[in-house]
């Protein structure tokens, strides 16, 4: 149960942070955001703000999305002869078009619609008391659809495809950017929780409770200078010296550890503890605890994590295998393991997954943010927009590829994790 809760929290935070990036910069670019959804499936709660954005909390606590005006099937269609109730503002402009039998306004004007243009001319025409009349429609007017859903109309100037190239590009990039920011922040938080960043350039150590070194008398911040005669000046020297000293070690044999404590040099016999195929002496690298060290340490972890992911991506391209990919099932398995290991493991996993999500979404495949960014760049170079039909077909092809890949990866994960 703890693993499921951890998975939902991690996955939810990653997606919400990602989608908030798209949402925020879409609004800043003048694009009408129709909906910001947390979760998937049926609505549990909804609220419409003054800007016409619907905020929804949905039943399945997995994922979320941002729906922008002009994306996909976003056209409002009113069939000829459809009865509607028009509510006018003080200037005589239509501020509400009610196509349903609910949410009726007693002051509204009944009409049978014969024509409309809610994108360019912003007008609606129809029969009012058997007389044909045309009314101007307010730029921020709303439509109550037949099922009772109320949405804002989307004039051309607030649709995604009519925003500036720069506006669309930053809107598409903002999702991955937010994931990178989240990953860096969580890594910095992790370093602060750990008390600092491991100092691998030093031979000072932290001694693990009940470990081999602790039993031999070593204490935190002691300085190991030699192991079995091998000189130690750094953490890398220490690990290599332990490896060399224990290479042919018998079950009850010890190694000699020379260390400096309170300016006094001591040599003790330490019996290493075996873990799997390696020996340890129960020490960790000392920590750099300065505020600046912690900040830089978090950035270093994020940078290292990004390079690890990029190398994995490179390996995937040069030698593709489903076993190198992981979907929601693999993510659940990792979340479950992290939950068992404590908060620090959960934060480390969240940070890595956030950076991974950011990098993955920048791959220039249609349907991913990277594909949209690539089309924005092509449009900027050509200095003319890509046809909506062409863009739709390209995106559809990308979606098909991603769906097939996700099904294959999920099936492979299920077989690997549960069987």
UniProtKB/Swiss-Prot annotation:
Active site: 19
GO-annotated cellular components: plasma membrane
Coiled coil: none
Topology versus the membrane: Multi-pass membrane protein
Localisation per UniProt entry: Cell membrane
Keywords: Cell membrane, Hydrolase, Membrane, Metal-binding, Metalloprotease, Protease, Transmembrane, Transmembrane helix, Zinc
Family: Belongs to the peptidase M50B family.
Cofactor(s) it depends on: Zn(2+)
Alphabetical list of InterPro entries matching this protein: PDZ, PDZ_sf, Pept_M50_Zn, Peptidase_M50
Main location: membrane
Documented EC number(s): 3.4.24.-
Lineage, top ranks: Bacteria, Bacillati, Bacillota, Bacilli, Lactobacillales
Source taxon at top rank: Bacteria
PROSITE patterns linked: ZINC_PROTEASE
Molecular function as annotated in GO: metal ion binding; metalloendopeptidase activity
Protein known as: Putative zinc metalloprotease spyM18_2031
GO biological process annotation, one example: proteolysis
Binding site for Zn(2+): 18, 22
CDD domains: S2P-M50_PDZ_RseP-like
Native source species: Streptococcus pyogenes serotype M18 (strain MGAS8232)
Enzyme class, broadest EC rank: hydrolase
Domain PDZ: start-end pairs: 175-274
UniProt keyword annotation of Transferase present: no
Alphabetized PANTHER family for the sequence: MEMBRANE METALLOPROTEASE ARASP2, CHLOROPLASTIC-RELATED, REGULATOR OF SIGMA-E PROTEASE RSEP
Transmembrane segments: 169-191, 301-323, 343-365, 392-411
């Amino acid at each position: 149960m703890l693993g499921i809760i951890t998975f939902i929290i991690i996955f939810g935070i990653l997606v919400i942070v990602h989608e908030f990036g798209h949402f925020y910069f879409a609004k800043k670019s003048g694009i009408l955001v129709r909906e910001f959804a947390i979760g998937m499936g049926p609505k549990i709660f909804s609220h419409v703000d003054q800007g016409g954005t619907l905020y929804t909390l949905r039943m399945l606590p997995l994922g979320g999305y941002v729906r922008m005006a002009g994306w996909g099937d976003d056209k409002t269609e009113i069939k000829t002869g459809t009865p509607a109730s028009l509510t006018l503002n003080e200037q005589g402009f239509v501020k509400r078009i009610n196509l349903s039998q609910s949410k009726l306004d007693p002051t509204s004007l009944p009409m049978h619609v014969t024509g409309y243009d809610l994108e360019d001319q912003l007008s609606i025409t129809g029969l009012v008391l058997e007389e044909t009349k045309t009314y101007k429609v307010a730029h921020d007017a709303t439509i109550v659809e037949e099922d009772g859903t109320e949405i804002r109309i989307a004039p051309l100037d607030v649709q995604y495809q009519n925003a500036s190239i720069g506006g669309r590009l930053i809107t598409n990039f903002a999702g991955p950017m937010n994931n990178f920011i989240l990953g860096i922040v969580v890594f910095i938080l992790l370093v602060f929780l750990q008390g600092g960043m491991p100092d691998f350039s030093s031979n000072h150590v932290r001694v693990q409770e009940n470990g081999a070194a602790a039993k031999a008398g070593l204490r935190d911040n002691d300085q190991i200078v030699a192991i079995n005669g091998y000189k130690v000046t750094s953490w890398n020297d220490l690990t290599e010296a332990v490896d060399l000293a224990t290479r042919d070690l018998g079950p009850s044999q010890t190694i000699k550890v020379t260390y400096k404590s309170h300016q006094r040099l001591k040599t003790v016999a330490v019996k290493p503890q075996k873990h799997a195929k390696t020996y340890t002496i129960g020490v960790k690298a000392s920590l750099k605890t300065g505020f600046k060290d912690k900040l830089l340490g978090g950035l270093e972890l994020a940078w290292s994590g990004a390079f690890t992911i990029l190398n994995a991506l490179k390996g995937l391209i040069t030698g593709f295998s489903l076993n190198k990919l992981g979907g929601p099932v693999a993510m659940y398995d990792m979340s479950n393991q992290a939950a068992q290991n404590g908060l620090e493991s959960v934060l480390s996993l969240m940070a890595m997954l956030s950076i991974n999500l950011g990098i993955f979404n920048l791959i220039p495949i249609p349907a991913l943010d990277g594909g949209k960014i690539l089309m924005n760049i092509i449009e900027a170079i050509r200095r003319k927009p890509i046809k909506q039909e062409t863009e739709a077909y390209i995106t559809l092809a990308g979606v098909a590829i991603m769906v097939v890949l996700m099904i294959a990866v999920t099936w492979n994960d299920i077989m690997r994790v549960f069987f």
